[in-house]
């Protein structure tokens, strides 16, 4: 989810929710022939973390990304090698958790249109970043060639792997799907610990985001009485929204697994990526950038694998049970609905579908601000903001009004904090530069020797490395430096240049005699080339001061999509200079190898989410900062020209139809600002909105939307669209996709002050279907990634006569929108016109091959089981046996044999029991054909949902022992002030718990771990075990009897408008809160209590239309919901 700092904020505010994972590692033993071999981990052993896991869910995109383009080490060379890395990583994660019932692996499929806008932005920016890096690599090669060295053809023609391939419908995703099927079959055949597992693979051909497909499966399963209310879940993934999704299931035994990104690397302290020295970061470095030989491949450094951590959702629920209690409420407290309100308020701060409100930044305490308003207004609202995934619009207006009162103060405080931070950073930078100068002076003192009144200095001796070291094996290496008088050292470069010129004009013998001088001249030429490539020249200190002064008056901005006329001339001059220097390098080159300095192309430090693309935030070529100008900012050339972008905007205007959503960016082009990216990823720019000054609303709407504040009708359209988005997101998290084609049609959010009459908004979502994979690729890919599309579709992205050419601007503007980091900027891309895109795609479909048509179709979930699983014989008999002929209707799963898992199955046409599974990666010798294959696969269909998801704990729930002490709770009630907050030192179910002052430490959850994955854990003593000490906190008593998921109590059922005011909460006592009923959002009639309608009441047609779940309220409930579990024959 789009809240990069959410995980850190949660772990600091609620420290006990984080546990370090205890992980078994393979032991090295001596084999039968005396060789050292690794003994595999015994999966069937008890979980070392002290608790057993029933179901493990893997958001596979969180595994694929770090395996295909890892940080800190070279990426795998081929896609087959990437598959092996994915296998290794997945097995490590599975061995940490050791699920006993279900392992579900979900890959992102076609996303809802609301998410595709964000995907489009990321992929365009990733392509732009890749182009910048490729340009820098080619410049480095030119520099190396100018030094007189050859660059291999392989190095010169090397192309980096395009990370945009990780998108549904590409050949890479097709390979990933079949490779995971192979690996799962291999594990079921060879690992006895997997024999009882049911593995569900939902690949990229099944519509929906990976984590939402997982949650949809959980919601459907828990709507049946066969579901175990005490099922323990773990979900792996890197997205912060997994925490919200886990809470939204109201399954209390849930943990989120992820890498500990804040763990200290085993490589030791980080070195500067500019100079390679320890003690400072690249942003504060004064040294020249290092260079490396482009022919030398990067070698991975050995380091310990990153540790993992659990985020304990049950513990987070304990914190929220304290945090969300409001004294003196006129209605009963319901923790489940209060948690829903808390989740909804986080959506205001950030999500993947809407830009966050300008006044809300999580780093500024935005969640606490909203929570404070919610606590103050909850008694007056008379009920909760949300109701089982529906928003009460009248109550949402109350929260927005409370935020509106604070917006001016928030903006002013933000400006004060930024100025204070900038002053502090400038002071630290100056101090760091002073320290570097002192270190440099000490180094020079060490390299200076006074002898007989003459001062000698050490100068580099390239001859020491010219031929690789010693003259003869019996002789020592040449020294790496010479001692020369200081006066001669100053004149030496000049003399070397003169010698080189004379030698090159002479005979071959002159060249040989003066090869040292020629080599030094080549290196000088290379330095000149570097200065030209970086937009600078070799100048003295006084000249640098003049340039720095000039720079204050001239525009040095970079990372824009347009070049000015002056910049075009400057670029032409640079190209001429490069050509001259290259020619000089070829003429003056000698046949000797010189080990050059390293060419640094790594990214500098900057904070950005895993897998998030940035716009040249870290890879700019930099000019070394002058000692007397520590705040000098490096420059970067601009890319692209303005004509293409202007044309595309014109086409957008001409082709917009009346049915398309409003697109103010197309109607009112925003003046493009020029950006300047620093070494640390921050951006220097002029903020022309100035939210901290009076009149900011007028400036904001004029700059961002191209309208005046007085145009109230337009602003009302923006606020309604935004409120639609909030309702869409909440329902997406709780009930499934409301509408696949809905999206927020603006790049910016309105102010809280501008929402009015929210309760009267008529919000409806119409039923729709997801895109096909190739339609999504055309909707999110830039033209640079067209190689992943079939050839007939590639022309739509580049041909001048393409009807959708304007969807693929070669350059685009990044608006920083008040942010500091480059990756936080807003990519101002034109929104896709769905009708035009689908029409263009249809015109090319006849040209697709059969295999390409298969890739462009929806697929099925697949379930794998081993031959020892109780379901194996049933599947073979009913699906693959002699009596199983022409099976066309899905067969229900026997819930007794599946331990409560429901659904239906059909034969997998790619599976023949007991046959050989051909390897999809034949180039990998460790992955041969699988023979015999002791597993079986079937097409698996999720069960229809028996009733809408409800925010309650299921009957039979058994609470875990309390994590929080009374001291912890008091600390939370005080808002984290006073006392000492508790935290966990060790991971696992029996980590140490530290309370506030004077509290004894004890081990909770002592006693034997669960050994049976299918039974609830035995009662555990709170008074320690053999390994514990002290006393643990007793388990809390439930505030009221568990409420049945099927009714329980006489709760006040429904009012036809789920977003209207609720009836008197006292009407039904402690019954379940009122779920929603079908009806228009803006209508307010009250109806007598009725059972909640079931949008899943009629089973979906076995092969009907794909979902929508997105029915209009007021219309009859649709058949099915979420996404269609039977997509194969749509």
UniProtKB/Swiss-Prot annotation:
Zinc fingers (CCHC-type) by residue: 270-287
GO molecular function, one term: 5'-3' RNA exonuclease activity
GO cellular component: nucleus
UniProt biased composition (Basic and acidic residues): 411-447, 541-551, 570-588
Bias (Acidic residues): 617-629, 643-660
Top enzyme category: hydrolase
Compositional bias ranges of the Gly residues kind: 987-999
Protein's UniProt keywords contain Transferase: no
Record keywords: Coiled coil, Exonuclease, Hydrolase, Metal-binding, mRNA processing, Nuclease, Nucleus, rRNA processing, Transcription, Transcription regulation, Transcription termination, Zinc, Zinc-finger
Record flagged with keyword Nucleotide-binding: no
Region span, Disordered: 411-448, 533-678, 965-1036, 1072-1130
Subcellular localization, as worded in the UniProt entry: Nucleus
Listed InterPro entries: 5_3_exoribonuclease, Xrn1_helical, Xrn1_N, Xrn2/3/4, Znf_CCHC, Znf_CCHC_sf
Main location: nucleus
EC id: 3.1.13.-
Pro residues bias: start-end ranges: 1086-1104
Coiled coil, from the record: 121-147, 412-441
Any one GO BP annotation for this protein: DNA-templated transcription termination
One Pfam short name: zf-CCHC
CDD domains given in the database record: PIN_XRN1-2-like
Subunit structure: Interacts with RAI1; the interaction is direct, stabilizes RAT1 protein structure and may stimulate its exoribonuclease activity. The interaction also stimulates RAI1 pyrophosphohydrolase activity, probably by recruiting it to mRNA substrates.
Functional note: Possesses 5'->3' exoribonuclease activity. Required for the processing of nuclear mRNA and rRNA precursors. May promote the termination of transcription by RNA polymerase II. Essential for vegetative cell growth and chromosome segregation.
Family membership noted in the UniProt record: Belongs to the 5'-3' exonuclease family. XRN2/RAT1 subfamily.
Full protein name: 5'-3' exoribonuclease 2
Organism of origin: Cryptococcus neoformans var. neoformans serotype D (strain B-3501A) (Filobasidiella neoformans)
């Amino acid at each position: 989810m789009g809240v990069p700092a959410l995980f850190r904020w949660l772990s600091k505010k609620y420290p006990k929710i984080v546990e370090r994972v205890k992980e078994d590692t393979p032991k090295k033993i001596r084999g039968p022939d005396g060789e050292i071999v690794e003994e595999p981990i015994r999966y069937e052993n008890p979980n070392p973390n002290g608790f057993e896991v029933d179901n493990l869910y893997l958001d596979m995109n969180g595994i694929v990304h770090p395996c295909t383009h890892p940080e800190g080490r070279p990426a795998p060379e081929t896609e087959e090698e990437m598959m092996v890395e994915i296998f290794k990583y997945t097995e490590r994660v599975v061995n940490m958790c050791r699920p006993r019932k279900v392992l579900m692996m979900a890959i992102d499929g076609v996303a809802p249109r609301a998410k595709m806008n964000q995907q489009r932005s990321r992929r365009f920016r990733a392509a732009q970043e890749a182009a910048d890096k490729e340009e820098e690599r080619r410049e480095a090669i030119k520099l190396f060639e100018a030094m007189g060295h050859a660059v291999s053809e392989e190095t010169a023609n090397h192309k980096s792997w395009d990370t945009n391939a990780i998108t549904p419908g590409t050949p890479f995703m097709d390979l990933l799907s079949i490779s995971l099927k192979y690996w799962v079959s291999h594990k079921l055949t060879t690992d006895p610990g997997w024999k009882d597992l049911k593995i569900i693979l939902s690949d990229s051909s099944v519509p929906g985001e990976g984590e939402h497909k997982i949650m949809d499966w959980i919601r459907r399963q828990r709507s049946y009485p066969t579901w175990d209310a005490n099922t323990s879940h773990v979900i792996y993934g890197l997205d912060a929204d997994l925490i919200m999704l886990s809470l939204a299931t109201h399954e209390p035994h849930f943990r989120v697994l992820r890498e500990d990104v804040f763990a200290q690397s085993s490589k030791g302290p980080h070195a500067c990526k500019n100079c390679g020295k320890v003690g400072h970061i690249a942003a504060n470095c004064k040294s020249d950038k290092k260079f490396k030989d482009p022919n030398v491949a990067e070698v991975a450094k050995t380091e310990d694998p990153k540790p993992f951590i659990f985020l304990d959702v049950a513990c987070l629920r304990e914190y929220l049970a304290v945090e969300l209690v409001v004294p003196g409420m006129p209605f009963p407290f319901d923790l489940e609905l209060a948690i829903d309100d808390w989740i909804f308020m986080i959506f205001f701060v950030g999500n993947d579908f809407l830009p966050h409100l300008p006044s809300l930044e999580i780093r500024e305490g935005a969640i606490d601000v909203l929570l404070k308003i919610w606590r103050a207004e909850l008694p007056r609202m008379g009920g909760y903001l949300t109701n089982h995934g529906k928003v009460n619009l009248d109550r949402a207006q109350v929260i927005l009004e409370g935020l509106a009162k604070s917006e001016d103060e928030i903006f002013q405080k933000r400006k004060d904090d930024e100025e204070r931070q900038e002053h502090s950073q400038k002071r630290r930078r100056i101090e760091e530069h002073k320290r570097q100068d002192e270190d440099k002076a000490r180094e020079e003192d060490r390299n200076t020797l006074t002898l007989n009144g003459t001062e000698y200095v050490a100068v580099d001796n390239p001859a020491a490395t010219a031929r690789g070291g010693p003259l003869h094996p019996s002789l020592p290496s040449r020294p790496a430096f010479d001692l020369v008088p200081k006066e001669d050292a100053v004149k030496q470069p000049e003399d070397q240049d003169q010698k080189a010129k004379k030698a090159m004009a002479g005979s071959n013998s002159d060249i040989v005699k003066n090869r040292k001088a020629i080599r030094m001249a080549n290196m000088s030429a290379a330095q000149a080339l570097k200065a030209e490539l970086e937009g600078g020249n070799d100048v003295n200190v006084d000249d640098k001061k003049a340039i720095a002064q000039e720079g204050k008056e001239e525009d040095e901005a970079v990372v824009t999509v347009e070049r000015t006329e002056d910049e075009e001339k400057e670029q032409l001059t640079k190209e001429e200079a490069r050509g001259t220097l290259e020619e000089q390098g070829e003429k003056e080159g000698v046949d000797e190898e010189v080990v050059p300095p390293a060419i640094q192309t790594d990214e500098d430090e900057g904070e950005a989410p895993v897998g998030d693309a940035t716009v040249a935030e870290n890879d700019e070529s930099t000019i070394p900062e002058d000692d007397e100008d520590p705040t000098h900012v490096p420059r970067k050339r601009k890319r692209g020209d303005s004509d293409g972008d202007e044309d595309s905007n014109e086409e957008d205007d001409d082709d917009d139809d009346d049915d398309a959503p409003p697109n103010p960016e197309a109607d009112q082009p925003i003046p493009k600002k020029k950006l300047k990216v620093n070494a640390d990823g921050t951006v220097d720019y002029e903020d022309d909105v100035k939210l901290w000054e009076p009149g900011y609303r007028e400036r904001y709407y004029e700059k961002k939307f191209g309208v005046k504040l007085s145009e109230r009708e337009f602003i009302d359209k923006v606020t309604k669209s935004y409120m639609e988005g909030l309702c869409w997101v909440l329902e997406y998290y709780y009930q499934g996709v409301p509408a696949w084609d809905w999206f927020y049609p603006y790049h910016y959010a309105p102010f809280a002050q501008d929402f009015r009459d929210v309760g009267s908004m008529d919000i409806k979502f119409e039923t729709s279907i997801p895109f096909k994979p190739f339609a999504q690729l055309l909707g999110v890919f830039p033209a640079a990634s067209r190689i992943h599309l079939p050839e007939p579709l590639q022309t739509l992205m580049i041909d001048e006569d393409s009807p959708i050419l304007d969807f693929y601007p070669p350059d685009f503007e990044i608006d920083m929108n008040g942010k500091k980091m480059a990756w936080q900027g807003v990519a101002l891309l034109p929104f896709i016109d769905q009708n035009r895109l689908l029409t263009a795609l249809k015109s090319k479909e006849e040209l697709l091959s059969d295999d390409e048509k298969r890739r462009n179709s929806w697929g099925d979930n697949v379930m794998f089981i081993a031959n020892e699983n109780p379901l194996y014989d049933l599947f073979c008999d009913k699906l693959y046996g002699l009596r199983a002929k022409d099976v066309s209707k899905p067969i229900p799963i026997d819930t007794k044999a599946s331990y409560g898992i429901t659904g239906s199955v059909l034969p997998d046409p790619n599976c023949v029991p007991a046959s050989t599974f051909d390897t999809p990666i034949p180039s990998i010798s460790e992955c041969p054909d699988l023979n015999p294959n002791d597993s079986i696969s079937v097409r698996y269909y999720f069960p229809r949902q028996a009733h809408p998801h409800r925010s309650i704990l299921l009957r039979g729930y058994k609470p875990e022992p309390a994590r929080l002490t009374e001291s912890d709770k008091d600390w939370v009630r005080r808002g984290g002030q006073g006392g000492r907050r508790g935290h966990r030192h060790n991971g696992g179910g029996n980590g140490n718990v530290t309370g506030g002052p004077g509290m004894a430490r004890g081990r909770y959850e002592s006693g034997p771990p669960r050994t049976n994955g299918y039974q609830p854990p035995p009662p555990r003593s709170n008074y320690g075990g053999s390994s514990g000490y002290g006393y643990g906190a007793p388990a809390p008593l439930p505030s009221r009897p568990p409420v049945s998921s099927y009714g329980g109590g006489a709760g006040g059922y429904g009012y036809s408008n789920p977003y209207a005011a609720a009836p008197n909460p006292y009407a039904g006592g402690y019954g379940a809160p009122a779920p929603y009923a079908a009806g228009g959002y803006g209508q307010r009639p009250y109806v007598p209590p009725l059972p909640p309608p079931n949008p899943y009441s009629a089973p979906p047609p076995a092969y009907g239309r794909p979902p929508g779940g997105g029915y209009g309220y007021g219309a009859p409930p649709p058949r099915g919901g979420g996404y269609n579990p039977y997509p194969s024959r749509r």
